[in-house]
């Protein structure tokens, strides 16, 4: 399928207009309260540093779609409470220019419509496989990408684009890479493949389960990366451009809540984990733990492909399971099991479990209509999310892999 065709169809279907989060669709609760939060916390230190040095920022969003990168960057709260007229770091008066570059004419048109009232915003059609757009412009402070937009490029194309960015950028500029991780539990069929191959992907998760037919869904090819492969490609681009680059952050995102965990396009079992975490974040829904206690046995035939990835997935899955077991024990008033879970967990996780136990046992302190929906469920989801965010450097075992790079000239 031509690279832009599905996106143009998605725009026409309304997926890229202004949406509210919810239980299903492109901007579900996991997107807003897990994935967006992960991106924002990852870029926040660099954003705070840039704003401390520069009056107005210049931003280039690569694979911008309809401009969601602008929404992400302008809704990052400060790391410490401060007295300010705005709750967010990057306000409109601190933006000199936001340039959104995308291959899809429909996306560019939608972006122009979405932000027609903002004079600092511009959108351009650009094929990133052919190189960096807007090179006639002064250097940008942030070269941004999100939600795996750069996985549309081959290894060679990403290296070429990176070298051009490094040449164009100024000292202190930040580059944000966001690509698909190859070792995600969503697609074990890709684990044995090479980064040099572009492999099948689809956005069939936007369809209702009964319409998720591999024979009728629109497929296109993308590049799936490991953490080491991405860093090496960035370093090769730095060498090719004669630019020193510093990797600031390398993180996996959505390890167990990736979009395709709840589909069968790339694996034999359909889980309901993302849907259940959507319920946890939904403050109007009294959920349960069904679907949260996961079996990853379907990965057994693939685990030997990478011992490091296998260990990372096992450790994260073990911590995830400890949270859910503790929650189930609390609901059964099984205090012995709660105590056992806390005492057998690593220190940081034990503190989270103590917090959840305290909340559950003090529900009467919270004057809300539904304690589970309003307080307990969202806190459980945040603990699961924070477990992921506190993991070591990314290996490529999430739906997405994000890497922040600083230019040193």
Question: What name fits each language-model region?
Answer:
Residues 1-57, 68-72, 175-203:
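Conserved class I S-adenosyl-L-methionine
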Residues 67-130:
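Class I SAM-dependent methyltransferase SAM/SAH-binding core
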